[in-house]
Amino acid sequence: MSSQPKPRVAVVFGGRSSEHAISCVTAAGVLAALDGDVYDVVPIGITTTGRWVLVEDPARFELTDGALPEVPATGTPVGLPLDVDTKALQRLGGAPGAPALAELGEVDVVLPLLHGPFGEDGTLQGLLELSDTRYVGSGVLASAAGMDKQVMKLLLAGQGLPVGPWTSFRARRWDTDRDGVVAEVEALGYPVFVKPARAGSSIGITRVTSREGLAAAVAEAVSHDPKVVVEAALVGREIECGVLEDLDGGEPLTSLPGEVEVVGGHDFYDFEAKYLDSGNVRLTCPADLPDDVVAAVRRTAVRVFEAMGAEGLARVDLFVDPARGEDGIVVNEINTMPGFTPFSMYPRMWAATGVDYPELVHRLIQLALRRPTGLR
C-alpha cells in the first residue's frame, strides 16, 4: 500500500521592505521547526530587489552577533504557477542548453513569512490568489487593512472597539499645510508617537515630546512611507495577545497575554530593543494580570481579529490599565503576520498557553490546507 504523499510547503521570506532581515530570521526559525517527515519543504527567498530564488542553506539566516541576514541573489530563480490548472513552481533559466522554463513540482501551500510592505500588506496574498494557491494567514483585504494603521483604526473604531486618540496626514500636506498638521498633532497633547502608517517592527517610529522634535520625526516617518500616523502616548501596560483560528471552525483561540516592559536604554519598544538589545527589555509570558482582565484582553483580541476579517493568525497589541478592568483596555494594533522568530512574543505566548513552536507552525499549515481557494 502506497503511503500518502507529504504536503509540499513553500516557505517564502525576505522581500523588498525594510523588514527584510527580520523576515529572514523568522524563516530560519520556522524552517528548523518544520518536520521533514511530515512536510516536503521548499525554501524561497525574495531578494531586496524582488528576485525570487531557491535557498540552499536556511540556517545562514539565523540572527548571530547582531548581524542582520539578507537573501542572496545567487540562487536559482523561481516563479509561481503559470495558471490555476497547475500548482507547479517554475524554474526560470538554467544551465546552458537547459530549458529556459522548467517545472519544479507542485506546491500545496505557501507559508509567507514576509513583514511589512510588498509582502504582509496584501500584495503577496493577491499574487497567490491569482494563481489559486493556498497560503497561511489573512487574505488580501485583512492583510492590507492590518498593515495600514490609519485604515485599521478607522475599521476598529467603526466596530466599537476602543482606539486611542490619533491623527494622520500625508507628506504633501505636511509640505503645504504644516501649521494645520501641527495644530492637529498638538490637540493630542505631547508626548506623541510619529509613525509610518505602513511599516512594522517599530521601524521609523519616533517619540516626540515637543514641537521642536516634530519635523525630524515626520522626516524619519516619511522616509519609510508618505502616509504618517501620529498617536497620543497612552498610559498603561503594554500587553499582547495571540489569536489562532480553530482547526474545527469554532471561535478563534487566544493565548495567555504577554507583557512588554522596556527597563532601560530605550524610550519605547523600538527596533533595536526588539531584535538587537534584548537585555533592556523584559518579556513576561503570561502577564501578571487579574483573571478578569486576562479574560477581557482575550475577548477583545477575538473581537479585533473578527472585526478585521483576519484568518489564520494574528497578534493583537493593547494598552491596559488593570485598575479599570475592561474599561482600561485600548487597542493599539493588529499584526496579521506577527514576528515569528522562536524568541518573538507570538510563539512565546502560545508556548505559555501549551502550544509549542513546531506545533504552532503545524497548525497554521493545516489551517491553510483546509481553507478553500477563491472567494470565501
Curated annotation (Swiss-Prot):
Pfam families: Dala_Dala_lig_C, Dala_Dala_lig_N. GO terms for molecular function: ATP binding; D-alanine-D-alanine ligase activity; metal ion binding. It comes from the Bacteria. ATP binds at residues 185-240. InterPro entries: ATP-grasp, ATP_grasp_subdomain_1, D-Ala_lig_Van_CS, D_ala_D_ala, Dala_Dala_lig_C, Dala_Dala_lig_N, PreATP-grasp_dom_sf. GO terms for biological process: cell wall organization; peptidoglycan biosynthetic process; regulation of cell shape. HAMAP family: Dala_Dala_lig. This is D-alanine--D-alanine ligase. It comes from Kineococcus radiotolerans (strain ATCC BAA-149 / DSM 14245 / SRS30216).
